[in-house]
Amino acid sequence: MPKPFARTYLAPVNEVKRASISTEDIKRVQKICLDMADERRLLVALISDTGMRLSEALGLIWDDIYLDHEYPHISLTTHPWRPLKTAGSKRLIPLVGAAYEAVKIMHRQRTAPFLFNSYTNANGCNGNSCSAALNKWLKKYVPDAVIHSFRHSFRDRLRNAGVQSEMIDQLGGWSNQSVGQGYGEGFNLRSLSVSLKRFI
């Protein structure tokens, strides 16, 4: 006998929806970050326009960065000091907007293989310490936000720019929502870059 509610999703009673950050606040914080241009603020700028998880960004090395490519991008892959959360987390992320500007500044200042030397070395990433420091700083400008809010906003901004859900999932490394999306190689870098520039 068919179950009429078998396909109905019910959110957990105690589930808390994390707040996104408004576009206006994102732009304001990005400007502050690029003006200050220190390690922590450049990290915030990088996350704000790539949608990366904090741990993903902290674990980057310069070999992951392709600034001189026709479509500048990050090749996000697993490393011994920073594994990725899921298989779908391995992805190409175009560098646009504040993220691109932040990486250019860091590239001129680079002194080691890691982008964020204060928090990452060959033994691992100190994400907890970094998260606490960034959240404390961010609340001065956006009281209800935390660093992970940029990831939620990334999805909202892409959706509002008319980017199809399958591409949004690929850009953010979110799990595919259908069996069909698991076939093929996904969207190419040009398509990803063009779509990501829609919200800049």
Regions found by a protein language model. Name each.
Residues 1, 65-71, 144, 163-184:
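Short, polar N-cap/turn motifs at the start of nucleic acid-interacting alpha helices
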Residues 2-60, 151:
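Basic, Lys/Arg- and aromatic-enriched nucleic-acid-binding interface segment
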Residues 9, 59-102:
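Conserved tyrosine-mediated DNA breakage-rejoining catalytic core shared by Y-recombinases
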Residues 12-15, 20, 121-122, 161, ...:
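Catalytic-site neighborhood detector that most strongly recognizes the C-terminal catalytic loop/helix
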Residues 26, 79, 96-143, 154:
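Active-site/catalytic core of tyrosine-dependent DNA strand-transfer enzymes
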Residues 39-40, 126, 130, 134, ...:
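Hydrophobic (often cysteine-bearing) scaffold residues that line and stabilize catalytic clefts
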Residues 40, 70, 89, 110, ...:
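Exposed loop/turn and edge beta-strand positions of beta-sandwich/beta-sheet ligand-binding modules
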Residues 45, 49, 56, 149-175, ...:
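C-terminal catalytic core of tyrosine-transesterase DNA break-rejoin enzymes
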